[in-house]
Amino acid sequence: MRPAGRSNNQVRPVTLTRNYTKHAEGSVLVEFGDTKVLCTASIEEGVPRFLKGQGQGWITAEYGMLPRSTHTRNAREAAKGKQGGRTMEIQRLIARALRAAVDLKALGEFTITLDCDVLQADGGTRTASITGACVALADALQKLVENGKLKTNPMKGMVAAVSVGIVNGEAICDLEYVEDSAAETDMNVVMTEDGRIIEVQGTAEGEPFTHEELLTLLALARGGIESIVATQKAALAN
């Protein structure tokens, strides 16, 4: 029995609250059960130097955890004077995932920065960040159209992510912290709304997993992501 009585293929309740803050062009509070992340999308005119003159835009991301988002307090990385390797890995993942959602040529020379700040962590903070940031990005892009900066919205479709893993020999979807910490296999999967894979991060924490188990986990992830995308679209329709 899973901690919340969920079936193995069931994601936690997902909530997406749009326009959560007033200054950013897009802002979303995303909740996967007890994991809560504030995602904002900020638009700037211009692109990084390596893209100047190429007529395309750029999407980048930053990720951080509030000191008491976890069971015990972690010092802010700013106080330590440098970002940790995990932080850099996750923010690059978020940016790669969201670039797959946008036609960067159609975006033109704008840069959109996605800031994902974890308010409370209970497993799956990177997958929640991608899911929430995609909705914040959609709102920001629509603002560019409404303000006459773009003729058409360059969003190609939704992108979402979910964790899957093997715990006590069983494949499960959307791991909470207690499940994640006990997982024999831990995997994060990012997909487009039509089920194409953007990224798979999978690690055998204990026993190596088989090819068949990999396919089972990917199928679980696709089912979970279909449910999450439906929630994203419902949030954007309101």
UniProtKB/Swiss-Prot annotation:
Gene Ontology molecular function: 3'-5'-RNA exonuclease activity; tRNA binding; tRNA nucleotidyltransferase activity
Reactions mediated catalytically: tRNA(n+1) + phosphate = tRNA(n) + a ribonucleoside 5'-diphosphate
Keyword annotations from UniProtKB, A to Z: Nucleotidyltransferase, RNA-binding, rRNA processing, Transferase, tRNA processing, tRNA-binding
GO biological process, one term: rRNA processing
EC number assigned by the record: 2.7.7.56
Amino-acid positions noted as binding phosphate in the UniProt annotation, renumbered to this chain: 86, 124-126
Domain of life: Bacteria
Subunit and interaction comment: Homohexameric ring arranged as a trimer of dimers.
Main function: Phosphorolytic 3'-5' exoribonuclease that plays an important role in tRNA 3'-end maturation. Removes nucleotide residues following the 3'-CCA terminus of tRNAs; can also add nucleotides to the ends of RNA molecules by using nucleoside diphosphates as substrates, but this may not be physiologically important. Probably plays a role in initiation of 16S rRNA degradation (leading to ribosome degradation) during starvation.
Family designation: Belongs to the RNase PH family.
Name listed for the protein in its UniProt record: Ribonuclease PH
Organism encoding this protein: Shigella flexneri
Native organism taxonomy: Bacteria, Pseudomonadati, Pseudomonadota, Gammaproteobacteria, Enterobacterales
